[in-house]
Amino acid sequence: MKRIFFLLVICCYFASGAEKNARMAIGAEKSVHVVKKAGGEKAPTLLLMGGIQGDEPGGFNATDVFLMHYKILSGNVWVVPVLNRYAMLLNHRGIYGDLNRKFAYLNPKDPEYPLIQSIKGLVVDPQVQVIMHLHDGSGFYRPTYKSALLNPRRWGNSSIIDQDELPGVEFGHLKRLSLGITDHVNQFLLKPIHKYHVRNTHTARGDKEMEKALTYFAIKHKKAAFANEASKELSLAQRVYYHLLAIEGLMQEVGITYTKDFTLKPASIYRLINDPNLTLTMNENILLPLYGLRSQLKFFPFPKNTPINQISLQSQSYILGLLPRKNQIWLKYGNKLMTRLHPLYLDFDRSLKDIDIEVDGKITSAAPASILEVKRSFKILPKEGYRVNVIGFSLKNGGKKPNEVGVKIAYKNLDQRYSIDKRGKIYRIEIYKGDAFSGMVLVRFI
């Protein structure tokens, strides 16, 4: 069954109509999005978080893969896929400064103050017993100096704790648990240089920077907290590989059981991240594949007079977002730009349930936000009160508002420049009620 959820878009973008430039205001998020995965038996609750720095894709891609492909059998895992969504979409460490240095004291006037309060509230939730925070760090940590790449000042491939023990707290044996995590990871190293080590920052001894971090805030509030660092020297798939190993190691240490639907190898992770079956549904009436899109899609329907953060996005993935950029709206998948949408602002009509289309001689019913596979040709059947525009097809004497129904359309009749994909195989069927946009159906020639 396809997993769907609504994504928050973290920019306010007010469209005043196609004839005017839209007003845009970009601001920090006010709260985090939490996805709770619950098992069937009582066991601890792990709070798993990634993406506090927007330019560390290993963390938020790991949480995304975890949410899509892991099942919790006993215990609970609460997942924040990305803490700093705006910075992620811009591929920036932190637009308003380092979000992971705002947990000790923060001026209430700081743009990210509400977001920090939301994260703090989640950390101190009585149901949470243990916390893991995912980062991508430089080089490879070593307790003693080995080289410029392997030394105590590096962070990559390490398990971070603030102190050895947290007395009187469940799972307070931080060093012991961290050693359990690193022992688990080190059983499955891709190369010896990737070896994991425990790094104790001894924060309470006066590390002023680490005192401002999320994990130390958790420690001060009697929560066992760990950070996992994957090296920035590694590919994205390798970073996610080590993050997932660390997550599995911690779950085993605290008694959370799980299954997953793939073999934990970098090649498998690469395929999951770059899955050609990933899709996005916008406004409940537009469907797009994530991969293979043209670099730009022009005259793309958007509801006018609607803030962009009120546009619903549904996907199997949890790290999608829309990013306004001048007169375009960029579709982002984590840090990756999937396409640039050139918006056409329209009134939206919600009345259309489906439309009949003859595909290769057989009539089928298609709902908005669906895709049909075509071998030879298709023909849209008339529907009272609606008109149809097939993007890339020109009807003779069609006028400015064509109604391209009752016409058999073969692949050769379509202008490939107007396909949505680079291969020239997928085309938009747009349905209108008067001037209002009612929905889009895609046809893919196979």
Predicted regions and their residues:
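Structured catalytic-domain cores with a bias toward divalent-metal coordination
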Residues: 2, 16-446
